Amino acid sequence: MKPQKIIYKIEEFPAIHYLHNALTKNYDVIFKYSENIINNKKVSQIKRIPGQWTGQKADDFVNGLDDTWIYGWTDQNTWFNYLMIYNNHIINNGDDMDNQIINDIFIPIKSIINICGLSLLMPEATIKPHIDENTTISKNRLAYHFNVFGNGSIININGILLKQKPKKSLVFDSGFIHSVTNGNEYRLLIYIDFNVLLSKNFIYGRITDLSNDKIIIKSYYKHDNGIYNINHYNYGQGLATVSQYTVSLMFNNQRSDILKNDSILIEIISS
């Protein structure tokens, strides 16, 4: 019997690959956004409990939240969570600039996101061993971390020790037992619980040619050959003709603002 996978490469999921690149490219802006949330949002006395991010319990919990940090479920008050996206819905709580940042980066992939938020851990804090029984591959969900700041936090996933560093991403099955031991710095990361199948329902690649009304891209992923109905969050709907790694795009509305060598993310609507 093949052992179940614990750690995944971001390149296995086009939407997550895009997100990592977008967060890295806009790192300075994300850093400022995070600092603004830390400095200007109050801490609620609400403390969530394990497993509270799924089902009706989650709906009720989120509906009762204000625009505040909440305590994580640890015994010590050293772990804080701030909700950004819930069930594909972006929660615009910050100022207009903050909202624009989040919208620009996350709108293209919001359909894959079950939960997204900031996770702030105090220096020397720990998160005890636990499992997230719903965020596991058997339920079509995995966990994604993007470390914004903090150098020295160690996550232990089923005996695999990984150091979390700024600008680094991690995808893992949190149905395995895992824990965190922080170093002597504050650690802040973006946490996402995402839909695995939907995250693969994208074409992500580099534009190699612009000819007439067609856009040719070299996909970072091999797709099944065929013709697909597609949608781009900004450019609208169109068709994609796929031949393994080569994809020819045609949008219903002609585009003049697309540049060669740019990366582009396209959602597959149907085949």
Swiss-Prot record:
Classification via InterPro entries: Asp/Arg/Pro-Hydrxlase, IPNS-like_sf
Pfam families xref list: Asp_Arg_Hydrox
Protein name per Swiss-Prot or TrEMBL: Uncharacterized protein L888
Biological source species: Acanthamoeba polyphaga mimivirus (APMV)
